[in-house]
Amino acid sequence: MQHVNHSSFDKASKAGFIIALGIVYGDIGTSPLYTMQSLVENQGGISSVTESFILGSISLIIWTLTLITTIKYVLVALKADNHHEGGIFSLYTLVRKMTPWLIVPAVIGGATLLSDGALTPAVTVTSAVEGLKVVPSLQHIFQNQSNVIFATLFILLLLFAIQRFGTGVIGKLFGPIMFIWFAFLGISGLLNSFAHPEVFKAINPYYGLKLLFSPENHKGIFILGSIFLATTGAEALYSDLGHVGRGNIHVSWPFVKVAIILSYCGQGAWILANKNAGNELNPFFASIPSQFTMHVVILATLAAIIASQALISGSFTLVSEAMRLKIFPQFRSTYPGDNIGQTYIPVINWFLFAITTSIVLLFKTSAHMEAAYGLAITITMLMTTILLSFFLIQKGVKRGLVLLMMIFFGILEGIFFLASAVKFMHGGYVVVIIAVAIIFIMIIWYKGSKIVSRYVKLLDLKDYIGQLDKLRHDHRYPIYHTNVVYLTNRMEGDMIDKSIMYSILDKRPKKAQVYWFVNIKVTDEPYTAEYKVDMMGTDFIVKVELYLGFKMRQTVSRYLRTIVEELLESGRLPKQGKTYSVRPDSKVGDFRFIVLDERFSSSQNLKPGERFVMLMKSSVKHWTATPIRWFGLQFSEVTTEVVPLIFTANRGLPIKEKIELTTTGD
C-alpha cells in the first residue's frame, strides 16, 4: 500500500480517485449487502414492513451517513492529520503531550477497532456467498448453509494465506473493481427505485425521527443498532488518510455516498413492490434480475474480499504503530512490498484468521453475525471523538465550540452504543471479549515499560570513561571486536543502563577500539529519520540517538552504516584499517552487536501489583519478535546475553551462620 506524496496531499487526481475507491471504502461500500436485510429481519420479515418503515429506515441511514461519516470524519477528522497520516494512534500522538490520561481512549479505541476488524471479513464474505442461494442453477447446493460456510472458510483461508506475499500487482485491480461495484450499486439502485419513487422522500429527516418513536417499529430505539451497520467503515476512512490523501477522499466520498444511498433506496423500493416474495430473501440479491445474479454474486464477493483485505492491512498498520509507540508487544514483522506501507505481522494475521473463522463457525449465517456487528466500533468512534476534541482545542478552536461538538457527537454515538449494546447477548460479547483481551495485553506492556523506567538502575557513563579507555589498552585481554554496539531502550543524557556496563566490565571484559551505545527514540511525526551523536570528548565512545517516526522500520544496522560513513568523512571517528578484506578501500573494522535479553526475576523487591504486571509481561514476551529481527540484525554479527533486569542493588537475604557448640570432656 503506497503512501500519498506529501506535495499532493490536498490535491485530487483521476488515479487517486480510483485508488481511494479500492483502499478506503471497502467496509462502508459493502454494507448494502447486509444492512437492509438486518432491518427487515428484525421487523419480522419482508411481509411485515410498511412504507413508513422503509422510508424511516432509509432516512435514518442517510442522516447517519451524513452526520457521522460526512461531517465528523470527512469534514472534521480529516483535518487532524499527523504529517499527512490519519487513524486513532496518529491522532493520539498529536495530543498525548496535553495530558497523560489520553493514553486511555487511544488504547481502548485501538483495541476495539482491531477486534471489530476480525468480524468484518466474516460478515462481508458470508453475505456475498449467501447470494448464491438465489442463483437458480446453484440453489440446490447453497440452500444448505453448510456449503455456504465451507465456501466462506475456503475464501478466508486463501485471503489470509496470501498476506505474507503482499498485495503487489493484484492490489492495482482493487480500485477499478470497486469503481465497477459502486457504479453497479448506484445504477441498480436507481433503476429499482423507479418501482416506488416515493422512497426518495426519505431524504427528509422527519421520516427517520418519526420511525424511532412509532409503535410499528418493533425494536424502538434499538433499531439504530442495525442502522449503524451502514456507517461502520467511517473509522477506516480516517485511518487510510495517509494512503490516498485528503483531496482524493473529499472528491471520491460524494460519489460513494450517492451510490450507497441509491442502493438502499432501490432495495427499499423493491421490498415495497414485492412484499409477498418471501421473508428469507436478502433484498440486495433478490432485487437483481435472475439473469444477472451470478455476475453480481461474483462482483459482491470480490468487493467483500477487497473490503476484508483493506481491514487486514489496516490491522497490520494499527498494530505496527502501537508497537513503535511501545504500547503493544513487538511481534515479528516483515515487509513484502517495496514501500513502507506494506507490513505483514504473522502473529496478527493468524490471530485474525482464527477469530474470523471461529465467528463463521459459531454464528453460521450473516444474519446472526450482523446481530454481533458494530458494538465495538461505536466505542472506537467515541474514543476518536474524545481525542479529536483535544486536537481542536490544541489548534485554537474556541472551547465552547469544541464542547458543543463533543456533546453532540458524544450523545449521538452514545445513543448508537446503547442501541448496539443489546447485541452483547446476541454475539456482541465475542468482540467485547477480544477487545478486553487486547486492552489487557496493551496495559500490561505499557505499564511494564513504565515500571522498568521508574525503577531500573542507571549509571553515569562519564564515570566509566577511564575504565573503558584503560580496557582498550590492556594487553592482558584479547581484542573482542573492533566495534562493539549496544542497543539500549534506556539512555537519558549520559545515563545508561547498568546492565550494559555489567556486560562490558563484569562479565569477560570486552576489549574494543570503539564502544557504541545506540538508543531509538520514536517521534510523534510518522516519517522522521534523524540522529544525534555525542562522543563525550573521546574517539572511542559513540552515543547515538536515532529519532525515528512511529511508522518507520527500526533497522538499526542500515542506519548505523550511514552514520559510520558520515563520522569517518568528518574525521570524528578514526579510520580503522583492515589487514584482510575483500574491500581494499574499507575504512572501518568489524562490528559486533550485543543484544541484552533482560529477564525479570520474581525475587525483585516490587509491590504485588507491579510484580504481577512484570510477570505477565515476561509471559507475553515469549511470543514477541527477538531484538535481532526487530532491529534488522539477521545478517549482522550478534551476541545475545541473558542478564537480570536490575531494579535496585540486590541485597542478600538475611541468614545467620549456624555455629555448633562443641563440648570438651573434663
UniProtKB/Swiss-Prot annotation:
> What membrane topology was assigned to this protein in its record?
Multi-pass membrane protein
Q: Name one Pfam family in it.
A: K_trans_C
Q: Which InterPro entries match?
A: K+_transporter, K_trans_C, K_trans_N, Kup
Primary localization: membrane
UniProt GO molecular function: potassium ion transmembrane transporter activity; symporter activity
The superkingdom listed in its UniProt entry is: Bacteria
| Localization in the cell | Cell membrane
Q: Which UniProt keywords apply?
A: Cell membrane, Ion transport, Membrane, Potassium, Potassium transport, Symport, Transmembrane, Transmembrane helix, Transport
What reaction does this enzyme carry out catalytically? K(+)(in) + H(+)(in) = K(+)(out) + H(+)(out)
- Where do transmembrane segments lie in this chain? 16-36, 58-78, 99-119, 141-161, 167-187, 221-241, 253-273, 292-312, 343-363, 373-393, 402-422, 424-444
| SS bond list | none
Spell out the GO cellular component terms annotated for this protein, sorted alphabetically and separated by semicolons.
Answer: plasma membrane
Q: Which family does it belong to?
A: Belongs to the HAK/KUP transporter (TC 2.A.72) family.
Q: What does this protein do?
A: Transport of potassium into the cell. Likely operates as a K(+):H(+) symporter.
Q: What is this protein called?
A: Probable potassium transport system protein Kup
Organism annotation: Streptococcus agalactiae serotype III (strain NEM316)
